Amino acid sequence: MNDLKPILFPGMEPRRPLVIAGPCSAETEEQVLRTARELAAEGVRIYRAGLWKPRTLPGGFEGVGAEGLAWLRRVKRETGMYTATEVATHEHVTAALAGGVDLLWIGARTAANPFA
């Protein structure tokens, strides 16, 4: 564990803990922007929001999908925060990167069963 490197983006100080915060699920543009503004006012620099939601059982809300990418771009533009979202497929990765998302992660459910 001696080879750990800090996770930094331009303009961020190397401090601990690194706080990444935001809603588990992006549901509306208003919710995303309101939450981002409140978190930015508290000094959070990385905003996370789930756009694609893996579910154990089919038929539940699976997220707003690519529609939410415009919301994250607006978060970045209006607050200066970096943005992050969970991805599960090659299509998600391609869309998120094309949409300007700064940080991607693969969740536990996805690692076990990628939106099967």
Predicted segments with their positions:
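N-terminal amphipathic alpha-helix/helix-capping segment at the start of soluble metabolic enzymes
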Residues: M1-I20
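Long, contiguous binding/interaction regions
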Residues: N2-D3, A21, E27, A36, ...
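Active-site-adjacent beta->alpha loops and helix N-cap segments on the catalytic face
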Residues: D3-P6, E29-Q31, T56-L72, T89-T94, ...
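Solvent-exposed alpha-helices and their adjacent loops that cap or buttress functional pockets
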Residues: P10-P14, R74-R77, A95-A98
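Nucleotide/phosphate-binding sheet-loop regions of phosphoryl- and nucleotidyl-transfer enzymes
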Residues: G11-P17, T28-R34, W52-L57
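Hydrophobic faces of well-ordered beta-strands that scaffold small-molecule active sites
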Residues: L18-P23, R45-A49, T83-T85, L104-I106
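Glycine-enriched alpha-helix->loop->beta-strand junction motifs that scaffold or abut catalytic
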Residues: G43, A95-W105
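Glycine-rich phosphate-binding "P-loop"
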Residues: L51-E62, R77-T83, L104
